[in-house]
Amino acid sequence: MKFRPCIDIHNGSVKQIVGGTLSDRGNQAEDNFVSEYDAAFYANMYREDGLTGGHIILLNKADSEYYEADLAQAKEALTAFPRGLQIGGGVNLQNAESFLDMQASHVIVTSFVFRDGRIDWDHLKQLISLVGREHLVLDLSCRFVQDDYYIVTDRWQKVTKQHFSV
């Protein structure tokens, strides 16, 4: 078994939110835990403990008043653990390379590769061409709806038409 650490950043703080409570309206989420430490603290701890393959998730939208604070936290964490963490949250063609330039090992993407509830293969191919498949993680987070699991996008708020049977 391998432990994969996570740093979730919302409204400029490292926190754990209650699943399904994230809302773009008012940048709100129900907090389960808000850390007194910054993202760099956790990145340093993960580096010192040899915990690779972890990720940072920016939970605010890019047009949120808190996005720059989220991004500043992420930059500090990536500086503390260069190439040791992946990053996701609003990744697209305009910013994917900048995250890798900030020393992320990979970019994590979901919403950008979906359009009208379906996988947009052109967007996926463009992203692969831009950053290389070796630096790309496709997050297929799912939610159970009726009798099946469906991929969710846009900070787990939008259920797509793409389902998985189990």
Each language-model region and where it sits:
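Catalytic cores of alpha/beta
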Residues: 73-106
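Glycine-rich, proline-tolerant flexible connector loops at the mouths of alpha/beta enzymes
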Residues: 51-72, 111-118
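Non-catalytic positions within long, well-ordered alpha-helices that form the structural scaffold/packing
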Residues: 47-50, 100-101
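Conserved anion-binding
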Residues: 10, 15-25, 100-166
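Short catalytic helix/loop segments, enriched in acidic residues and glycine
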Residues: 20-44
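Alpha-helix-loop-beta-strand connector modules within alpha/beta enzyme cores
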Residues: 64-86, 124-141
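Hydrophobic faces of well-ordered beta-strands that scaffold small-molecule active sites
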Residues: 2-10, 54-56, 83-89, 107-109, ...
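Generic structural signal for well-ordered alpha-helices
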Residues: 40-44, 71-78, 96, 121-128, ...
